[in-house]
A protein has these predicted regions:
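The feature captures the beta-strand-to-loop junction immediately N-terminal to the Walker
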Residues: 37-39
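Helix-to-loop junction immediately C-terminal to a conserved catalytic motif
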Residues: 52
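Conserved ABC transporter NBD signature motif
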Residues: 59-68, 76
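Conserved ABC ATPase "signature" region
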Residues: 112-130
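Conserved ABC ATPase signature
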Residues: 134-138, 142
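H-loop/switch region of ABC-family ATPase nucleotide-binding domains
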Residues: 191-192
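Conserved beta-strand-loop-alpha-helix hinge in the C-terminal portion
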Residues: 211-234
């Protein structure tokens, strides 16, 4: 069975020549919940963009067995959905229904299929009954859930999320963690919140200076005080308090 994501010796430089990612090699199995952790500017968000083909570098990226090329971006993006750092970037239609239906409509699904996809996605994220709400009237937590619904309606096998817990209060952050752990898709989550990462991930990948430092079981990596501090990261509270 193909891996969910395979990356081999991938590198990327910004237009000004600054190196953003260097020789990234990473294998991700289906069904995993991956936390990409590292200091600000480490390359986490850039790597998420590369996975979906929004930026192109050197090396190889394979998504669910499909090698990413300029000619198959549409196929690749049917397998991997992206939740951007600012959920409002994915909420641009008059109603929530329209936003969640946007992807399925562009896939060419008929009206009934679209309606079913929208209903299922909104139900999954806890926004049933809000289909006709204007997105700008939603709370921060609801906007984040809505942005996830716009991806779920496309039925991808893999979902990437860039700082999904940003701007959320503790209760909404806990609600989001519960939502994400209830999804069956492979999740790749870039976050600076170690407590949030520890609540969700079964696997952690530390990225620093555009390179993968280590990857492995989340509990082992995130409870390693020396390793975490060497890369400017805090050990999650659950390990400090002996809850793990």
């Amino acid at each position: 069975m193909a891996k969910a994501i395979q990356i081999e010796k991938f590198s990327y430089s910004y237009p000004d020549g600054t190196k953003a990612l260097s020789d990234i090699t990473l294998d991700i199995d289906h069904g995993r919940r991956i936390a990409l952790i590292g200091p600000n500017g480490a390359g986490k968000s850039t790597l998420l963009l590369a996975m979906a083909g929004f930026i192109r570098g050197t090396g190889t990226i394979i998504i669910d067995g499909l090698k990413l090329t300029n000619g198959n971006l549409k196929q690749v993006r049917s397998r991997i959905g992206c939740c951007l750092e600012n959920p409002e970037d994915q909420l641009f239609m008059p109603t929530l229904f329209d936003d969640v239906a946007f992807g399925p409509l562009n896939m060419g699904l008929d009206a009934e299929q679209v309606r079913q996809r929208v209903s299922a996605a909104l139900d999954k994220v806890g926004l049933s009954g809000m289909a006709q709400r204007a997105p700008h009237h939603l709370s921060a937590g609801q906007k984040r859930a809505a942005s996830i619904a716009t991806v779920l309606s496309m039925s991808p096998k893999i979902i990437t999320l860039d700082e999904p817990d940003g701007s959320l209060d503790p209760r909404r952050r806990d609600n989001l963690a519960s939502l994400l752990t209830g999804l069956s898709q492979t999740l790749v989550i870039a976050t600076c919140s170690m407590d949030f990462a520890a609540a969700i991930a079964d696997t952690a990948v530390i990225i620093d200076g555009g390179r993968v430092v280590t990857a492995g079981p989340a509990d082992e990596i995130m409870s390693d005080l020396k390793l975490m501090s060497n890369h400017g990261l805090e050990v999650p509270k659950k390990f400090i308090n002996g809850q793990a």
